[in-house]
Amino acid sequence: MAFLQVVLLMLLPSALAEKWAVIAAGSQGFMNYRHQADACHAYQIMLRSGVKAENIILMMQDDVAKDSENPFPGQLFNKPGNDSPDVYKGCKVDYAGDIVTAQLFLDVLTGNTTGAKGKILKSTEEDTVFVNFVDHGGVGIVAFPNGPFLHVKELSQTLKKMQSQKMFKQLVFYMEACESGSMFPDLQKDGKILAVTASNGQESSWGTYCGDAAMVKGKNIGSCLGDLFSVSWMEDDDLGKFASETFKHQIASVTKRTNQSHVCSFGDKSFENEAIGKIEMALEGMNEVAPSAAGSVDARDIYVSQAYWAWQNANDEMKDKAWTRLVRIVEDRQKDDQLFAKIGLKACGECPKCQEKMLGDRSELKDMECHSMLAQEVHKHCPVSASHHATGGWNGYNMKFSQVLLNLCEGKEALGKNVEELSKIIQDECTEAKGITELVV
């Protein structure tokens, strides 16, 4: 065989390699505007950078652009300014509405045609895959707009399945959520998966371009435009440095700009020094300077912060309605605080030190099975917070109490209780709280 033929055969796998992207926004409602704006911005970056449209899979509720509160119907903006681009224009949503669930996300990732009836990941061992998830989270869990949450146990199993099915040469996973650093506990250092998270496993992520900073073309959107970690990496990508900038350099830049939480990276860092363009290809002609993020708010407080801003800025006609909305959000937060305090009290009995430990400790997640079971009990039995657009017992605020469930699981031996007994405590307290809520409503 001629030398040239041998060389061509050796180059054939890389020449045939494809680039894929899976993007998911896990929330719904206008208060969560930023998540769908983030997702569409990510879609535009993938498309603009040369990833084939048929290789980009986007799932989100897709309700914000058409929401009656949107001052620009049919449009979404991910940054402020008079020249801010409409990221919704040309943003092709593959899965929208009530079908967007955690299970659908997992089915798409693993190429399961039984569960996902539309586009799925069809990548091979020669391909590179980029996954981007944006939404609310807590220790070991992230939310979806419909159905149950996604647990770290399920995500871990899915990534291992993708590895065993040889679905990628390299996979990069960017996750925007509170406590997102808790979602990748067992990535191998040589597993060809690099995960980057908006926060560590014990802190909130942050929204940005909120309040007075949410001005677009002379109008205030009335909701945060983006998330600090997400806009940081995307506005960095918008600078058009893909061909030369490495993942390591981008992570360092994004870490510096994401100054309210600790950006973390997990897994295989052997390709950190490779150019981002190897995963996402290279952008040309994008040289605008990224504006510095302003108006950042702890993601846990965005609902109450936005409601307060809306009340302050409401006209006389809307003042009472805005106040009622603000009061409802504050009351719902207080109910969540009280509910999880009661769960801790019931588990501990009359032991103040134990209660303090259950509610305040930052134990590490080890017993995933127990934590998953208790988290499911909250989803199934606790009151649904309409003010937080929740579809189960978890919402963007109370997901911070996922840590309490972790503490219960890791302390169950000292408590003298098994998983079933802890589950019963949650069922009873949530059912009682739900009954009180229904009586009030």
Where are these regions (language model features)?
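Cysteine endopeptidase catalytic domains of the caspase/legumain-like
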Residues: F3, L9-V441
